[in-house]
């Protein structure tokens, strides 16, 4: 499932959607479309796909919670997995991407405490302990086929990669991060269309106010 099919569905159903859901999916689809048009530029595809994800999931929350954005992933994915009667996300995690997910979870370069230690914010032994703990938790989630927890951990790692690129911590088309960028982009290309489709299949759910609502000109 790709942009064209999802956009046709959006056009057919948007009149019955709540304004917030219609806006979220419209924005997310626009960035998915741009990612599909950026074949050959992996960095651009990753950026556009992350914006598509953010457009779909982000909510306007109190200022005190904005520093804990990563903690929001779990509740979002739990909602989607609970609504996924065809187990599409389960299939993606366990049948299509299980190998690359294990590689991502073992990659220290997309584990934020590693960089915090490198920048002198935490001791080296602390990041290593946290990395081992994170891997044990991830291994437990993998062993239990806990789709929600695995997706949440993976997206926290993707979020670190997103920070590296968006905040200028990476060179365009650099060979230094190609492996994780390839894996993350491939995963996003499959997960994002499914989550947009699930949201459109369940307009009765409360998806929350758009973080930046559309304001018509006076």
Residue ranges and their predicted role:
Residues 22-40, 138:
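Short amphipathic alpha-helical segments and their helix-coil junctions
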Residues 1-20, 49-141:
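Helix-loop junctions and short alpha-helical segments
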Residues 39, 64-67, 172-178:
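Short, surface-exposed loop/turn segments at secondary-structure junctions
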Residues 4-15, 19, 117-218:
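Polyanionic, low-complexity intrinsically disordered segments
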Residues 30-37, 47-58, 157:
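Short, hydrophobic/amphipathic alpha-helical patches that form generic packing surfaces
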Residues 39-42, 59, 87, 111, ...:
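Short secondary-structure junctions and interdomain/linker hinges
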Residues 29, 43-50, 74, 98, ...:
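Non-catalytic, well-ordered alpha-helical scaffold segments
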């Amino acid at each position: 499932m790709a942009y064209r099919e999802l956009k046709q569905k959006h056009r057919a159903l948007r009149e019955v959607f709540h304004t917030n859901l219609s806006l979220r999916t419209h924005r997310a689809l626009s960035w998915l479309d741009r990612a599909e048009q950026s074949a050959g530029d992996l960095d651009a595809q990753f950026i556009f796909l992350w914006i598509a994800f953010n457009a779909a999931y982000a909510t306007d929350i109190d200022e005190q919670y904005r520093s804990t954005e990563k903690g929001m992933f779990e509740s979002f994915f739990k909602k989607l997995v609970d609504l996924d009667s065809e187990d599409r996300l389960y299939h993606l995690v366990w049948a299509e991407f299980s190998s690359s997910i294990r590689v991502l979870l073992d990659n220290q370069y997309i584990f934020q405490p590693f960089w915090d230690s490198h920048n002198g914010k935490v001791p080296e032994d602390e990041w290593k302990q946290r990395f081992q703990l994170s891997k044990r938790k991830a291994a437990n989630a993998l062993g239990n086929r806990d789709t929600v927890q695995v997706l949440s951990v993976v997206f926290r790692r993707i979020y670190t990669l997103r920070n590296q690129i968006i905040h200028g911590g990476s060179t365009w088309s650099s060979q230094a991060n190609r492996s994780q960028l390839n894996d993350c982009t491939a995963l996003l290309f499959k997960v994002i269309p499914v989550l947009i489709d699930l949201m459109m299949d369940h307009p009765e759910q409360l998806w929350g106010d758009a973080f930046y609502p559309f304001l018509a000109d006076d």
